[in-house]
Amino acid sequence: MGLMDIHNAVCSLVIGVAILIATSQATFVDWGSSITSMGDFWESTCSAVGVSIAFSSGFSVLFYMGLVAVISALLAGSYHACFRLFTADMFKEEW
């Protein structure tokens, strides 16, 4: 299987998924009615109330710890890659 065959298969798959999404979304749109005719658009029970930072739940603490770990890993990886590039360039130089 050549590279062109894989490219054509991926393109066909992407186009098929796009057509499927476009046709499924078109069935949910009601073009004849407006928002005011559907009733009250805003519901007080669905509005966001925010997250308390001072008294946060265990899940949010774990989420932020994971976020810090991911950011630290990305920074360490980028520093390591940059350090390797500079040292490789430095050892190529002839004195």
Swiss-Prot record:
Main localization, broad class: virion
GO cellular component terms attached to this protein's record: host cell Golgi apparatus; host cell membrane; membrane; viral envelope; virion membrane
UniProt entry keywords in alphabetical sequence: Disulfide bond, Host Golgi apparatus, Host membrane, Membrane, Signal, Transmembrane, Transmembrane helix, Viral envelope protein, Virion
Regions crossing the membrane: 56-76
Residue ranges, Intravirion side: 77-95
Residues in the Virion surface compartment per record: 27-55
Superkingdom to which the source organism belongs: Viruses
Database matches in InterPro entries: GN_domain, HSV_GN
Subcellular location per the Swiss-Prot or TrEMBL entry: Virion membrane; Host membrane; Host Golgi apparatus, Host trans-Golgi network
Membrane topology: Single-pass type I membrane protein
Secretion signal, residue range per the UniProt entry: 1-26
Function of the molecule: Envelope glycoprotein necessary for proper maturation of gM and modulation of its membrane fusion activity. Also plays a critical role in virion morphogenesis.
Family classification: Belongs to the herpesviridae glycoprotein N family.
Quaternary structure, from the entry: Interacts (via N-terminus) with gM (via N-terminus). The gM-gN heterodimer forms the gCII complex.
Protein name: Envelope glycoprotein N
Organism of derivation: Gallid herpesvirus 2 (strain Chicken/Md5/ATCC VR-987) (GaHV-2)
